Design a protein with these regions (language model features):
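Small/polar glycine-rich anion-binding or flexible loop at a beta-alpha turn
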Residues: 235-246, 273
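Short amphipathic alpha-helical interaction segments
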Residues: 245-260
Length: 278
């Protein structure tokens, strides 16, 4: 969470969990996580299997293992204290520019631009008259421009960043912006240009029938097995868990091998069972 009484570690965990996951889904899992593992030392010492199970339905469970690696790095290289420079933070596993900037700005009031997808969209529409940013990640020029727009006081700058994030999430949305309700639409370059559409517009990513869904089904089955205290599942049961109506015949084997390669699951040659990593 971004409250003043939350530790640097708690804030970092929250920001990593919030990547690509709605905050409403993150909050209860974050609370349980922080009660169980309140420090980097606790997470570093936990088993990978317990970490993945606690990640629950946040999605993209590889983030859970990166967070464990992040905790281990903080313990080994920073004495268990979360570093507070952009350079050191972005060297941690699973921590990119946005996550690092969010921690510095919202937790410590350090003056740094926080560029999530909402902020980037608001700025490119208002200033450039484009529907969407031209690049997937912020360019150096985009970051420098955002920095120049921030007030000098770091705490004030953080409030501006939060306001832009909320504005983009609630008003200047991705596909259905509420321009008629927008307080600044008379000054917005995109509105003044007649809301021109970009040639390449983002489209909702499908989930049903995809490899991502099949991977999720395998991970859910193994999380359940671990929670129930069993010694994993047979390979056949794992492949059956990945079968989706309408999916191609090779999908279960494909996603099974991908999860093995990514270190998300383990096949024990002695027991001939598939488990979460230890």
């Amino acid at each position: 969470m971004r409250a003043a009484d939350v530790s640097d570690w708690g804030t970092l965990v929250f920001e990593i969990m919030s990547q690509q996951t709605p905050i409403a889904r993150v909050q209860p899992i974050w609370l349980e996580w922080m009660q169980r593992w309140p420090t980097p030392e606790d997470v570093a010492a936990a088993s990978s299997a317990d970490i993945i199970v606690a990640w629950a339905n946040l999605g993209y469970p590889s983030r859970a293992l990166r967070l464990k690696a992040c905790a281990a790095t903080i313990v080994e290289k920073h004495g268990g204290e979360v570093p507070l420079t952009l350079k050191d933070l972005t060297l941690l596993p699973g921590v990119g520019n946005y996550t690092a900037s969010a921690l510095l700005a919202f937790r410590h009031g350090i003056r740094v631009p926080v560029l999530d997808t909402n902020v980037r969209r608001v700025l490119v529409r208002f200033l450039d008259g484009r529907e969407f940013p031209p690049h997937t990640t912020p360019s150096k020029a985009e970051t420098m421009r955002a920095d120049a727009l921030l007030p000098e006081d770091g705490h004030h700058a953080a409030r501006v960043s939060l306001a832009l994030m909320e504005f983009g999430a609630l008003v200047c949305t991705q596909l259905s912006p509420s321009c008629n309700e927008c307080a600044i639409h008379t000054h917005c370059a995109w509105a003044l240009a007649g809301h021109p559409k970009d040639e390449k517009r983002p489209t909702p990513q499908p989930y049903a029938g995809t490899d991502r869904q099949a991977r999720g089904r395998i991970m859910k089955a193994l999380r359940t097995a671990h929670f129930e205290g069993t010694d994993g599942l047979t390979k056949r049961k794992v492949l059956d868990a990945a079968r989706i109506d309408g999916g191609d015949r090779y999908q279960p084997t494909r996603v099974y091998r991908a999860l093995l390669k990514d270190g998300m699951i383990v096949f024990n040659e002695d027991t001939q069972r598939v488990t979460l990593p230890h």
